[in-house]
Structures are given as structure tokens and as C-alpha cells.
Amino acid sequence: MSRSLGIPVKLLHEASGHIVTVELKSGELYRGSMIECEDNWNCQLEDITYTAKDGKVSQLEHVFIRGSKVRFMVIPDILKHAPMFKRLDARIKGKSSSLGVGRGRGAMRGKPAAGPGRGTGGRGAVPPVRR
């Protein structure tokens, strides 16, 4: 998984192999085992219980759902304990395991101090006051 993916998309990838419920914008419901889900929410489900808008229920073997037609998905509660949330908690608490250099004040830690203020006092600096 890429670092640029948002949490909902990562959670969707974690839901592969679990039973999910997908409601489409048209009002139709699909409940089945998620085989695969793409970043754009395109999903493959198998062993589906399909509920039409009028309430009629039928069984389907295999379905591919276009992501732009999805209103929302219901995923299992067990995914609350997914490893990605543990990494997220660590990052929030300041115990980040990221490899990059931070962008805050501590980013220049260990570098020689440049003195107070900006710059080194070269050309364009304010001259000292003579007395």
C-alpha cells in the first residue's frame, strides 16, 4: 500500500476476505465476501445476498461493483484492531516510526547554530551603531 492513500482506502484494502455490505447510490444492497477492492472503490464480491430497492432478495455468485456508484460500505468491527491503526496511534502519540526528517524545529538538530535571527550578517545587514 502506498503512503499517499487515505485511511478509508487502506481500511477498504484490509477488508478483503471479510463479509461487507455495500449500498449503492441507487439504493440497492449487496452483502458478501469481498475478494478485492481497488483504490477507486471498485470491488469484487462473491456469495452475495442482493436486496433490490423494492426489498426483493436474491442470491448472486459473483459481482463487480463500480466505485463511483457506492454510497457507503459497512465493514466488520474486527478491523478496528487492524495494524494500520496501531501505526496511526503511534504517530499521533509522537512515537513515529517514519524514516523521513521532520519539518518542525527539531529538523536541524545536531547542526551548528547560525546565531540569533536570520542570516549571517553579510551584505545588506544593519551596520553597528557608532558612539
From Swiss-Prot:
Subcellular location(s) per record: Cytoplasm, Cytosol; Nucleus
Pfam families: LSM
Domain Sm: 7-79
Tissue specificity statement from the Swiss-Prot or TrEMBL entry: Expressed in young seedlings, roots, leaves, flowers and immature siliques.
Designated name of the protein: Small nuclear ribonucleoprotein SmD3b
Organism: Arabidopsis thaliana (Mouse-ear cress)
Ribonucleoprotein recorded as keyword: yes
CC per GO annotation: cytosol; nucleolus; spliceosomal complex
